[in-house]
A protein has these predicted regions:
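Sterically constrained small-residue positions within well-ordered secondary structures
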Residues: 122, 143, 159, 186-188, ...
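Extended substrate-binding grooves/exosites of carbohydrate-active enzymes
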Residues: 1-151, 155-162, 167-176
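Beta-strand-rich N-terminal accessory domains
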Residues: 156, 210, 215, 239-247
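Short beta-strand elements
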Residues: 218-244
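Intrinsically disordered, low-complexity Pro/Gly/Ser/Thr-rich segments with frequent PxxP/GP/PP motifs
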Residues: 165-214, 218-221
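Acidic/polar residues at beta-strand termini and the immediately following turn/coil
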Residues: 86, 144, 215-217, 247
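Surface-exposed beta-strand edges and their flanking turn/coil or helix-capping segments
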Residues: 12-15, 36-37, 68, 165-167, ...
Length: 247
């Protein structure tokens, strides 16, 4: 586990190793992590022998509490005629706790319980978006972007792309200037097709092409129109002015 990308590539290229490489852990999603997932998945897609790994871990294991919070309550002594109401006090802001937050001695490895793809409140952490991007099974690649040509690769092994549509947007200096869609994607599993999108490249500025693959009909856990894969391609990159001559 936790082979580096270059160790994984060395294993995949070595003919002495005939068994597939599947890491029992390889992506410790602690803090703002996951920045080298692309390096791993470029190799996974390049070498059939390298077949992936298990992310550590799914969800942060922190516990939800309000620090210094005293709840509303009623109190009474045995001799009291009536109960007394005491309003709650303290900080109402929530926090997520772990390990030594409940003991004088921290028996855990500090904040190692907070290392999930999603947070204790089940909200997505930043690396969840990177993980979803690298795991997507539909890819748009440039062919001749000035002429509107891209290729669409269906990475699925058992299903075609009949339930997806391609939605494209052309941006000039960050602003959408043209858009359209391809309603029918006739791409078989593990196959690639070339499409020509009917846009005109603006004469000036940075030009980017956003490509989204959206569901035509709902599927389990996913809604109609949901984007399940996407790509941004540079039609023309931004050009900086030439540096001034030395003084």
């Amino acid at each position: 586990m936790y082979y580096s990308p270059w160790d994984c590539e060395a294993y995949a290229k070595n003919p002495k190793y005939t068994r597939p490489l599947i890491q029992c852990e390889y992506n410790h999603t602690m803090g703002n992590s996951g920045g080298n997932l692309k390096e791993y998945w470029d190799l996974i897609r390049k070498y059939p022998k390298f077949q992936g790994g298990y992310d550590w871990d799914f969800v942060d294991q922190g516990l939800h509490r309000h620090p210094d919070f005293k709840a509303n309550r009623t109190v009474a002594d045995y001799d009291a005629i009536a109960a007394k109401y005491e309003p709650g006090t303290g900080n109402m802001a929530p926090e997520y706790t772990y390990g030594g937050d409940y003991n004088k001695i921290d028996a855990s490895d500090n904040n190692f319980n907070c290392n999930g793809i999603i947070g204790p409140d089940r909200q997505l952490n930043p690396h969840a978006y990177e993980l979803a991007y690298q795991y997507q099974n539909i890819w748009a690649e440039p062919v001749d972007l000035k002429a509107g040509k891209i290729s669409v690769y269906n990475e699925n092994f058992f299903r075609d792309l009949s339930n997806y549509k391609l939605v494209w947007t052309l941006l000039q200096d960050g602003k959408a200037v043209q858009n359209g869609e391809v309603a029918d994607l006739n791409v078989a599993p593990q196959q690639r097709v070339t499409l020509t999108l009917p846009y005109q490249v603006p004469a000036t500025g940075e030009v980017m092409l956003n490509v989204d693959f959206q569901l035509k009909d709902a599927e389990p856990l996913m809604t109609k129109g949901q984007t399940v894969a996407y790509r941004q391609l540079a039609v023309r990159e931004q050009t900086a002015p030439a540096a001034c001559c030395a003084m």
